[in-house]
A protein has these predicted regions:
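Sequence-level preference for short, compositionally simple segments enriched
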Residues: 1-214
């Protein structure tokens, strides 16, 4: 089961972040009824819509596998107007965490197919505290203003020997991503993980007082 939540104000809270687990294994290249493929924005394990979403003390993971085989595979599509995550594990490979909104225009026909494809692009504010986020290609991406506070960022080894942590698509005049007092440590070979690359022209991402391994 893949929860799709569209409420004004709600809380998801587990008893233990390592024992309360939401899991699914849907990849963007999986077939979709009547269509060629699922696509990135229908691959989520958990969809957070609505007004204010609070998520605490649990794990959300997408176990579809490596993006080279299954395509993008979201653990969380964070699309609520305000998102707060505390003590949450987000595990995946390519495109683990999407922080809405989408860019205005897609580059591939039907590339945004999903719940928000034809919706207005509404700005969101997101805050992640003491979270563990794992992936290998563009695994934190999107157009939100988002703060990552004392989080552990875990870039995973990828067969291309290159890992990109972020891919912001920050709208003009928005702040983008801020990582504060975070630890970046994974299993990539030395010097193969990059802090980010732009998904759109105004992409913004800042790292402050973070600890980076080789």
């Amino acid at each position: 089961e893949r929860p799709f939540i569209e409420l004004e104000d709600y809380v998801l809270e587990g008893e233990d972040r390592d024992k309360t687990i939401l899991t699914a294994g849907v990849g963007g290249r999986d077939p979709w009824p009547g269509e060629e493929k699922t696509g990135t924005f229908r691959s989520w394990t958990l969809f957070l819509g609505g007004g204010k979403a609070v998520v605490k003390n649990l794990t959300v993971q997408n176990t579809a596998g490596d993006g080279a085989r299954v395509g993008q595979a979201l653990a969380v599509c964070a699309d609520a107007g305000r998102v707060l995550m505390q003590g949450v594990n987000l595990y995946g490979n390519q495109d683990t965490l999407f922080t809405a909104p989408l860019p205005l225009r897609e580059r591939e026909k039907n590339g945004f197919r999903g719940p928000r494809q034809d919706s207005p692009r509404l700005n969101t504010e997101q805050y992640y505290q003491d979270c563990r986020i794992r992936g290998n290609i563009d695994f934190i991406f999107g157009g939100a203003n988002a703060v990552f506070d004392h989080c552990k960022i875990e870039p995973l080894h990828h067969k291309t020997q290159t890992c990109y942590i972020t891919a912001p698509s920050t709208p003009p005049e928005r702040l983008g991503y801020l990582f504060v007092d975070c630890i970046v440590h994974g299993d990539c070979p030395p010097h193969t993980a990059y802090l980010g690359r732009p998904w759109r022209a105004d992409a913004a991402c800042y790292w402050m007082d973070c600890s980076l391994s080789e």
